[in-house]
Swiss-Prot record:
The keyword Protein biosynthesis does not apply. This is Ribonucleases P/MRP protein subunit POP8. InterPro entries: Pop8, Pop8-like_dom. Pfam families: Pop8 (PF20976). GO terms for cellular component: cytosol; nucleolar ribonuclease P complex; nucleus; ribonuclease MRP complex. Component of nuclear RNase P and RNase MRP complexes. RNase P consists of an RNA moiety and at least 9 protein subunits including POP1, POP3, POP4, POP5, POP6, POP7, POP8, RPP1 and RPR2. RNase MRP complex consists of an RNA moiety and at least 10 protein subunits including POP1, POP3, POP4, POP5, POP6, POP7, POP8, RMP1, RPP1 and SNM1, many of which are shared with the RNase P complex. GO terms for molecular function: ribonuclease P activity. It comes from Saccharomyces cerevisiae (strain ATCC 204508 / S288c). Keywords: Hydrolase, Nucleus, rRNA processing, tRNA processing. Its EC number is 3.1.26.5. It catalyses: Endonucleolytic cleavage of RNA, removing 5'-extranucleotides from tRNA precursor. The gene is POP8. Component of ribonuclease P, a protein complex that generates mature tRNA molecules by cleaving their 5'-ends. Also a component of RNase MRP, which cleaves pre-rRNA sequences. The keyword Cell membrane does not apply.
Amino acid sequence: MGKKTFREWQYFKLSITSFDQDVDDAHAIDQMTWRQWLNNALKRSYGIFGEGVEYSFLHVDDKLAYIRVNHADKDTFSSSISTYISTDELVGSPLTVSILQESSSLRLLEVTDDDRLWLKKVMEEEEQDCKCI
């Protein structure tokens, strides 16, 4: 029998937009805005269970975010962000998030050359975490 691999994390590459180029150009999206949007989406879709979804930011670059989600919560996370459109309270216009990529392997995340530095650091941290288990 083959060795079964335990997957603790699911990785997401996300994009946020208002679908209004003027609004998108006028507002930089920081990690706090991303977090507020994601928390609102999870709460709206799943109530207190959605608020309990474990996720963390690997990297935020304005309209792109790389997120790590507990593997057990990946379906809850992806369905809540795929169906949620925010109110205009965050940037003055409703925002929506698209999943650009989803992977159970950090190594398979598609990043630009500029992103290789933070990705390498995150991969090293995860390797250290695996050695501790």
